[in-house]
Amino acid sequence: MEAVHCFRCYKFPSKQIEFYLTNCMHMFCIECERLCHPPEEEPLKCIQCSKTPIRIVKMGPELPMTIKSMFTPISEEINQYTRDLTRVLTFQHRQRASLSTFLERKVAAFDRLRDAYSEEKTKKEHYKKQLEEAYHLLKSKEHEISKLKKQLAEQAPPPQTPPRSNSLKVASSRSLETPSMMRVFSDSMYETPVQIQRRFTKAQAKAEAEAEAPAKSPGSKAQTTKCTSNYQSHPPASFETPIHHPPKTSMGFTTPANPPHMFPYLKKHEAQREKHKEHRNSQ
């Protein structure tokens, strides 16, 4: 700073001359500074403004920053302030630009949502109107259907119970006389050839005896019951074992319930039955 000088003698600072600064902002050289010290024990007094007491600080690199800033050239201060102000303005401008961009995106999104809401609201009103029309149409159709049903009920004749025909009676009796296929199959499957031959002989003899006996009226209940029981006790011819074929040694209980390991026992049992039959015939 070129304007620094002593307030009393107007000397300029140099390396050989020391300068001092008072708290009342007056500068003195080392010679003038001595005049601020009174001869007696009195407080320091400024020789420029006569202020007392004062504090005196030696000028140099050890000065506080608050005092050094007063000696900085004004151009440097302006440049520093300009740089600081520019940095502050740049920071604030970036903040405002970021916030403005965010708000613009939000406004655009809000506009899109508002348009979508308006479109969905219009669709909802349209669907609601269609639903109301369909509901009224359904009610009218239900009313027409109930009206037509009522008219048909009034025009229809009273129901009559038809008499049961003889054909139904005959069909029911035939269904009762028809043997169970499962029973016939199971009976023929679990009988031995000897038992089948014996049963067939008895049935043939019984049929011959009935043929020789006088025939009864077809409406007899006892005859119908007897024929039904006899018919149900014999399987159809397709399920019977042929009699003219000689029985094989492997014939018998050839079912999953009687595996082949039972054949020796069955063969022995049949041999005993044949032996017992021959003994009875000889007597």
Swiss-Prot record:
Coiled-coil residue spans: none
Entry's Gene Ontology cellular component terms: chromosome; synaptonemal complex
GO term, biological process aspect, one: meiotic chromosome segregation
Major location (coarse): nucleus
Molecular function terms from GO: SUMO transferase activity; zinc ion binding
Record has Zinc as a keyword: yes
Biased composition regions of type Polar residues, renumbered to the chain: 163-175, 220-235
Region (Disordered): 149-175, 201-283
Compartment annotation: Chromosome
Compositional bias (Basic and acidic residues): 267-283
Expression tissues: Expressed in the germline.
Bias kind Low complexity: ranges: 202-216
Zinc finger (RING-type) boundaries: 6-50
Alphabetized PANTHER family for the sequence: RING FINGER PROTEIN NARYA-RELATED (PTHR22663), ZIP HOMOLOGOUS PROTEIN 4 (PTHR22663:SF30)
Assembly mode: Interacts with zhp-3; the interaction is required for their localization along paired chromosomes and stability, and for the formation of chiasma during meiotic recombination.
Protein name: Zip homologous protein 4
Species for this entry: Caenorhabditis elegans
The encoding gene: zhp-4
